């Protein structure tokens, strides 16, 4: 009898532990990781699928938990109402630490952090969309909300709607 009870307790404990582990993974994927929990963040794979299905461009942030520049950008980004509003026009992807893709397309001018890249709905990185008001040696480094907003507006203009479709209709032929 005691063995059965011990097995039930052990089995129940394992179920709870497994559930908590799965729940934590879901929460971490949805978490803003300091960049704003009010924004609907996706993983890279889910974000690419959603962008392709919805036709929305992707805004992708690559950062590290230990990075001072990343920590400085987080509250500026998270507190910006305009970034939050513009985020509705993008599939927002937030990659931290080991989530950073190894593909060179995601580090067009180096592997510094944080980097913000814009991708079209097919998942292609558009390296021409850069921080025009930043350091030309670090084209994808944004240090404040105004720079991010400017990049988002440029990406929205270049990667959505009829202008984007007209420039890329020949790509499919």
From Swiss-Prot:
GO CC annotation: endoplasmic reticulum lumen
One GO-annotated biological process of the protein: defense response to virus
SUPFAM superfamilies recorded: Thioredoxin-like (SSF52833)
Catalytic activity: [protein]-disulfide + 2 glutathione = [protein]-dithiol + glutathione disulfide
Protein's UniProt keywords contain NADP: no
One Pfam family in the UniProt entry: Thioredoxin_7
Signal peptide (from-to): 1-29
Locus of motif Prevents secretion from ER: 170-173
Gene from which this protein is expressed: Txndc12
Annotated S-S bridges: 67-70
UniProt tissue specificity: Ubiquitously expressed. Expressed in stomach, spleen, intestine, gill, heart, head kidney and skin, with the highest levels in liver, brain, muscle and kidney.
Gene induction: (Microbial infection) Up-regulated to the highest level in liver 24 hours post Singapore grouper iridovirus (SGIV) infection. 8.2-fold induction after 4 hours of SGIV injection and the expression increases up to 42.3-fold at 24 hours post-injection, decreasing to 11.1-fold at 48 hours post-injection.
Subcellular localization: Endoplasmic reticulum lumen
Domain of life per record: Eukaryota
Regions crossing the membrane: none
Main location: endoplasmic reticulum
Keyword Repressor: no
Protein name in UniProt: Thioredoxin domain-containing protein 12
EC number: 1.8.4.2
Keyword annotations from UniProtKB, A to Z: Disulfide bond, Endoplasmic reticulum, Host-virus interaction, Oxidoreductase, Redox-active center, Signal
One Gene Ontology molecular-function label: protein-disulfide reductase (glutathione) activity
Alphabetical list of InterPro entries matching this protein: AGR/TXD, ERp19, Thioredoxin-like_sf, Thioredoxin_CS, Thioredoxin_domain
Described purpose of this protein according to its UniProt entry: Protein-disulfide reductase of the endoplasmic reticulum that promotes disulfide bond formation in client proteins through its thiol-disulfide oxidase activity. May function as an important antioxidant, and may be involved in the responses to viral infection.
């Amino acid at each position: 009898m005691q063995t059965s009870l011990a097995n039930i307790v052990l089995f129940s404990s394992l179920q709870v532990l497994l559930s908590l582990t799965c729940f934590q993974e879901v929460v971490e994927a949805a978490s803003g990781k300091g960049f704003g929990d009010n924004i609907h963040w996706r993983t890279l794979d889910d974000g690419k699928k959603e962008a392709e299905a919805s036709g929305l461009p992707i805004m992708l942030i690559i950062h590290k938990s230990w990075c001072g520049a990343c920590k400085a950008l987080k509250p500026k980004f998270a507190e910006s109402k305009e970034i939050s509003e513009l985020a509705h026009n993008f599939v927002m992807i937030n990659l931290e630490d080991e989530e950073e893709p190894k593909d060179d397309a995601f580090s067009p001018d180096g592997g510094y952090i944080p980097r913000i890249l814009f991708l079209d709905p097919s998942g292609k990185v558009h390296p021409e969309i850069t921080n025009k008001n930043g350091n030309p040696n670090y084209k994808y480094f944004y240090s404040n909300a105004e720079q991010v907003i400017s990049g988002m507006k440029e990406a929205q203009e270049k990667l959505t709607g009829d202008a984007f479709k007209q420039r890329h209709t020949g790509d499919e032929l």
